Structures are given as C-alpha cells and as structure tokens.
C-alpha cells in the first residue's frame, strides 16, 4: 500500500468511526422524563449483539423493547430462555422520542426478581 493510499484509508476510517459509535451507543433519543411499566407475554425475542430485544403488547399497542447487550444480560443471570416468546415479564423503561413503538429498558422483572440492565 502506498503512503498516500494508506493515509487516505486511515483518515477515512478515523472520520467514520465516531459516527458509528454514536449511532450505536446514543441513548439521547429516549425520553427519560416519561418512564413507564408494561407487564405481559413476550411475543418475540432476540438474544444477540448489539442489544437483546423483545416485543410485547400492552392495551392493544405493540412494543419493541431494547434491552442490554447479551454479555451484560448473561452477567446479570438472564439467558435467552428467560426472555423466550410466551414468557411473562415486566419491563420499566423510557419511550423513544421519534419511534412511538420503541423503548429503552432500564430493568426487567422475571419470575418475581428485579434485574437492572444498565
């Protein structure tokens, strides 16, 4: 790789990296002044990076909930089986400001046990 090509590649990589990190880790889109709780059956779940996710319904509204990364979930004792479809849980979180069906979850209650995710 020539010196100019290498510098161009490194400059481009450095310029794009912060944007990708901000897009992934930005929680600024969630309104922490409007917390809420939902209890119900899990309809769908994913246990994979970058974040685990579950879908539930409450009062006829379909919700998409963003949980913690799998490594943090496992560190707190939550496995894929505990958030499998058909399981009942309670979530406490904050709604997304521009996506009315999405929320970031702060903690879950599974089998009567409160588990912090952040």
Language-model region placement:
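Short nucleic-acid-contacting surface segments enriched for D/E, G, S/T with interspersed K/R
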Residues: 75-90
């Amino acid at each position: 790789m020539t010196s100019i090509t290498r510098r161009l590649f490194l400059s481009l990589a450095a310029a794009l990296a912060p944007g990708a990190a901000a897009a992934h880790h930005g929680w600024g889109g969630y309104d922490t002044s409007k917390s809420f709780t939902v209890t119900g059956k899990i309809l769908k779940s994913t246990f994979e990076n970058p974040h685990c996710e579950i879908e539930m319904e409450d009062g006829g509204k379909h919700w998409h909930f963003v949980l913690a990364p799998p490594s943090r979930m496992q560190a707190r004792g939550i496995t894929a089986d505990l958030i499998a479809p058909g399981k009942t849980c309670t979530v406490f979180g904050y709604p997304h400001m521009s996506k009315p069906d999405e929320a970031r979850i702060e903690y879950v209650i599974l089998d009567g046990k409160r588990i912090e995710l952040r």
